[in-house]
Amino acid sequence: MAAALSRKRRLEELTVDEFLASGFDSESESEPEGAPEAETQAVRAAAREPDGPGGSPLASRRKGGASEHKDQLSRLKDKDPEFYKFLQENDQSLLNFSDSDSSEDEEEQLHSLPNMLEEASEEEEEEDGVPRGPEGKRRDSVPVTLAMVEKWKQAAKQHLTPKLFHEVVQAFRAAVATTQGDEEGAETSKFQVTDSAVFNALVTFCIRDLFGCLQKLLFGKAPKDSSRVLQPSSSPLWAKLRLDVKAYLSSVIQLVACVAEATVAAAILQHVGSSVPYYLTFPKQCRMLLKRMVVLWSTGEETLRVLAFVVLIKVCRHKKDVFLSPVLKQMYITYVRNCKFTSPSTLPLINFMQRTLTELLALDTGVAYQHAFLYIRQLAIHLRNAMTTRRKETYQSVYNWQFVHCLYLWCRALSTICPSEALQPLIYPLSQVVIGCIKLVPTARFYPLRMHCVRALTLLSESTGTFIPVLPFILEIFQQVDFNRRPGRISSRPINFAVILKLSKVNLQEKAYRDGLVEQLYDLTLEYLHSQAHSIAFPELVLPAVLQLKSFLRECKVANYCRQVRQLLEKVQENAEHIRSVRQKVSFGVSDQRAVDAWEKRTREEGTPLTKYYSQWRKLRDREIQLEISGKERLEDLNFPEVKRRKVGDRKDEDRAEFKDLFDLESDDEDDAPDFTKRGMPGSPGAWQKVEEEDDDSSSSSGEEEVSKSEDGSPDTEAGLDPQELWQLAQGPEDELQDLQLSEED
């Protein structure tokens, strides 16, 4: 009793924190004094019984714990009302306690196993990424063999099943993981590919045969209309195959990024092109595919560029509203990035990007207008800044390859898509930007850039039927350049105006500059006048050009330049006379626009002298341009002498032949000089040639000159000496000819 009072007294002296840390009841309250030990043992024995009269011992223990906790809180309310009030204000969850809450909490803490364990499905295992065995442990990877691949191939051709397709996809993913160095992915896969022969066989099987079997499994027979695209999601088996197809498509994209061999990459891209309907089902994989195709379209080998573009246009044609606009934006940015530098080797690739990008823009003129308006406006802003500030940095932002190629791209796009009501309003602002680019720095050093702009305007004017005053920018060069001035230096290499924008001061003094300039002026004038050759106003249009060309012929004294310009003038005057004679027979006036258009259309179909000449000239010129791009045509025409250095063995053979002929000539004197055939003459032509070649191997012409002099009977030839003098010469120093070997026949 005294011990109980002391414990109770200590309880009253406890603080709130100490009270919460200790139990709520004293030992006397939880267990009455004098409780027999046998009763305690009986309680423990009852707890061990699996079933009691009132239910399971676990449930009774939960219920007893909840009621006991309630009693403790009620006693706390009587003993310490202040602390109980504190709990009411700060911890209501402790006071609002029920038997059900206690049972639920304890059930969460004590987990009970179900009667039947649920097995994971193949799809859940696929998303988990880690194949596991029946006990939840990671199972060992199965090595793929050639026999397994052949077995899969034969089974797929006979009848492809979802389970077989799942296994093949797992093996294909393991093979692709090895190409990326993904060791963890290869280890966690169900299969493992370690042999290169197995890798090649597996990839070949998947690319060539697997999707054909899958198509047969999903749709049965092929559709009668081959142009109609079947949606894989319309098949009843799609739900079972969806995740495996998704994993396979992702692996194919990874494989395209890893393959370096062009032929293998081309085969994979052909497979990707045939599987575009499957990519369209998965937007994420489709975006990944488009991003990779844009990279190949701009940087890949020529065949890969074409195949990548085929994939791009297939996707954009079927999903215009989703993918066309972002793909156009990405392709334009990539195009600008890749045309920063231009050379004869990169120019065909830039032209390919221009044409293919134009083809994508033609899919939807509404989307094309949005992009064209935005980027033409951007070019105009750069030009305006350069015209207002007049600093070197600002005009360099315009006079560069990226700006010029962008101008040419939009001129080509508007020309190709024409006629289009949506893009028609952009012709005028684009032509003004090009003309402003020409007028920004109109000096001789930027004539190549002017010619690029003139070509773009000519293309735009001819294709859209819009009159653009291009001829003044060509004729202005005839007035500014003095073609009679003697060149300051002569260059053996011609200037390729197709791959330059600016000429150096040294180039302006070269003869090759004026030769190329006259040739370019001839081409540009003929191209522009050909586009206007059917016009009813052609005689009046070419009048300034005729006057300028006649003035050039009067002033120029260079025959080659005059011959080209005179030929151009004759063709222009012939075409003007033809148009003048034909239009005299018409009865309508120039104010009748419909009649004028009909007459011009009929004239174009019938042809004019200038158009007939242009068609023949164009064929020859295209061939010449291709040769100039390769950089070989002009150097072949110059016929430079080649310095060929003979080998030591060749020299000895030729020396033997020369000495043999020489000794045949002196055969009459053999009796007087018996030892002559065994020693060479120091003054012989072969000996002089040998010495000169040893002194200077790079000068082959000098040796040939000595030989020619000897053959003509020059003073160096010793053939006219008498035998005694020849004998004295033969006794000369032997070290000069010790390397020569005479033929044993002599």
From Swiss-Prot:
The keyword Heme does not apply. Residues 26-36, 119-128, 664-674, 733-746 have a biased composition (Acidic residues). It is found in: Nucleus, Nucleoplasm; Nucleus, Nucleolus. Keywords: Apoptosis, Nucleus, Phosphoprotein, Repressor, Transcription, Transcription regulation. This is Nucleolar complex protein 2 homolog. The keyword Ligase does not apply. SUPFAM superfamilies: ARM repeat. Residues 19-82, 117-141, 662-746 are annotated as: Disordered. The modification Phosphoserine is found at S56, S93, S667, S743. Pfam families: Noc2. Interacts with p53/TP53. Interacts (via the N- and C-terminus domains) with AURKB (via the middle kinase domain). Interacts with TP63 (via activation domain). Interacts with histone H3 (via N-terminus and non-acetylated form preferentially). Associates with core histones and nucleosomes. Residues 65-82 have a biased composition (Basic and acidic residues). Belongs to the NOC2 family.
